[in-house]
């Protein structure tokens, strides 16, 4: 699959700033950095520049975003998380000339604040920064000291703002005024890897400017009330001031007047997915790399089986070595559903069985995968469609994100001593009681607080249920008296059938389905036990109550 994606142009090898886990000694995707720490080791992540393989998920950013509106069977929370992660922004690009003849390009969603720019900030890996490192030891030391933290936008925005002032200056694209140039630890290597600092109207820039005594120039005011920028930035749109020919215009109108100084642009927060990992247990990357030129590569699909199994090969006096890196763990899980559907195929990646079974009707997974597996799977599905391997462009029609079983208000963990052993519970109460309580205690999408008292209650109810279904007398034909008495139960039974069917098939609300069954059982007064019912009605009753209690049904038929 990777080789096919490579041939399609969806795989690139690039030098990029990555999240490096110093304990696991491997690269982590932004999605795998939690609060600045590695998702497996818990170690503080540092920024590092390496040569790695990446999948061009950015090419699908627009479709990944727009098609979320059509995923009606997905929880809105998951769809919104993906919208935020993809992060589409409309704005403008501006170019700043510099005293060193370099050109610094920036993207901004607030072009109306262009006259409030008082500094430019470059990322640690900006081309100008890299060039200056070679001759500036202080800058090099500063970068080494400030390379900790994730490469994600959220982590950078929360980090302590630190900067290094460069001797070079930039020139404002409209006024030609001199502007300071800084290297900032909060600037990401996304887009151009540079930003225009407008401290009066951006809180991150404001904090940075306050710390380093950089000028704060207000260029937008609220038309209805006085703005005080002595304590914080004014980030809302309003009326333009202190901006020459833009004065008096509304923010939107001012942006439209700047077309001759910049160009409209669309930007996405979503970055290409770096998939190279430095783990010995991962799936191998099927590529050979030129020993003297890392950009000269050969996919295994271009080699015979003998050559691809060698650690080193010689082609036209060029030495190629097998890539020592392995795939990110999410690569295989991003398309396994398609391969499992065509597991009998030995000569093709996927066969017609994949089209027969996909998309998956009902997918179940934790919400923690919203911007990981669930997003990557959507990308892979679209790519496989473009490769003519699949007919569908979306992998999962319906998605259920199940909650977590908690004990004492927290996730079960051996270190916390709050682990519940299901085998012991099944041995004492039976699998039906454990299953019933798990489904009844909370909606499937919410976390469940485990309670042995609740489990005991489920056990008692099942005993009552068992006895009740076998106490009811059966008869082929009812007399008039029995029919009249039974009519009330018949109405309640039909209502319950309708409710439980809807809860299971459409709403996926298992707890309310079980609650309906409980209401039905509690509804049956003693007089019904003295009344004969038809075998058909008793069968319906038994079927509906054994939907959630499968082993009760098994006992009946054994």
Model-derived features: positions:
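Conserved small/polar residues in nucleotide/adenosyl-binding loops
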Residues: 550-557
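Active-site-adjacent "gating/activation" loops or surface patches in catalytic cores
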Residues: 173-183, 325-363
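Residue patterns forming the tRNA-binding/recognition surfaces of aminoacyl-tRNA synthetases
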Residues: 1-106, 111, 194-293, 421-454, ...
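Gly/Pro-rich turn-and-neighbor structural signature
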Residues: 267-320, 331
């Amino acid at each position: 699959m990777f080789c096919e994606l490579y041939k399609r142009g969806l795989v690139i090898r690039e030098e990029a700033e990555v999240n490096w886990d110093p304990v696991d000694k491997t690269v982590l995707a932004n999605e795998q950095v939690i609060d600045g720490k590695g998702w497996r080791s818990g170690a503080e992540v540092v920024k590092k520049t390496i040569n790695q393989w990446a999948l061009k998920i950015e090419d699908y950013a627009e479709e990944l975003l727009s098609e979320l509106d059509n995923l009606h069977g997905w929880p809105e929370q998951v769809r919104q998380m993906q919208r935020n992660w993809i992060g589409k922004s409309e704005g403008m690009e501006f170019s700043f000339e510099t005293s060193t003849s370099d050109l610094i390009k920036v993207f901004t969603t607030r072009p109306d604040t262009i006259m409030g720019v008082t500094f430019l900030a470059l990322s640690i890996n900006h081309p100008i920064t890299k060039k200056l490192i070679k001759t500036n030891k202080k800058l090099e030391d500063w970068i080494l000291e400030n390379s900790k933290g994730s490469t994600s936008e959220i982590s950078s925005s929360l980090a302590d703002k630190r900067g290094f002032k460069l001797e070079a200056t930039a020139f404002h694209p409209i006024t030609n005024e001199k502007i300071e140039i800084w290297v900032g630890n909060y600037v990401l290597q996304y887009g151009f890897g540079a930003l225009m600092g407008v401290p009066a109207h951006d809180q991150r820039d404001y904090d940075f400017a306050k710390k380093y005594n950089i000028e704060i120039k207000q260029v937008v005011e609220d038309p209805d009330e006085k703005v005080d920028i002595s304590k914080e930035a004014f980030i809302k749109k309003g009326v333009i001031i202190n901006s020459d020919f833009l004065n008096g215009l509304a923010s939107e109108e001012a942006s439209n007047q700047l077309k001759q100084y910049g160009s409209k642009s669309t930007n996405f927060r979503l970055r290409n997915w770096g998939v190279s990992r430095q783990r010995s247990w991962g799936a191998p990357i099927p590529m050979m790399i030129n020993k003297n030129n890392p950009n000269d590569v050969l996919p295994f699909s271009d080699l015979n089986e003998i050559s691809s199994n060698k650690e080193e090969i010689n082609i036209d006096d060029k030495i190629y070595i097998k890539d020592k890196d392995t795939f990110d763990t999410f690569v295989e899980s991003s398309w396994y559903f398609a391969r499992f559907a065509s597991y009998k195929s030995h000569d093709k990646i996927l066969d017609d069985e994949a089209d027969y079974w996909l998309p998956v009707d009902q997918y179940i997974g934790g919400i923690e995968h919203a911007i990981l597996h669930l997003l990557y799977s959507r990308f892979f599905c679209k790519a496989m469609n473009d490769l003519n391997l699949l007919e569908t462009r979306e992998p999962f029609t319906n998605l259920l994100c199940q909650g977590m079983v908690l004990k004492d208000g927290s996730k079960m963990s051996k270190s916390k001593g709050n682990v519940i052993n299901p085998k012991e519970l099944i041995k004492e109460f039976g699998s039906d009681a454990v299953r019933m309580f798990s489904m009844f205690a909370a909606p499937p999408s919410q976390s469940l607080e485990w309670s042995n008292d609740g489990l005991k209650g489920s056990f008692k109810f099942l005993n009552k249920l068992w006895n009740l279904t076998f106490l009811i007398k059966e008869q082929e034909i009812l007399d008039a008296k029995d029919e009249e008495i039974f009519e009330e139960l018949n109405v309640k039974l039909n209502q319950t059938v309708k409710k439980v069917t809807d809860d299971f098939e459409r709403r996926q609300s298992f707890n309310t389905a079980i609650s309906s069954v409980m209401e039905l059982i509690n509804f049956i007064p003693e007089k019904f036990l003295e009344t004969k019912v038809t075998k058909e009605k008793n069968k319906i009753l038994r079927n509906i109550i054994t939907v959630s209690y499968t082993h009760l049904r098994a006992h009946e038929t054994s």
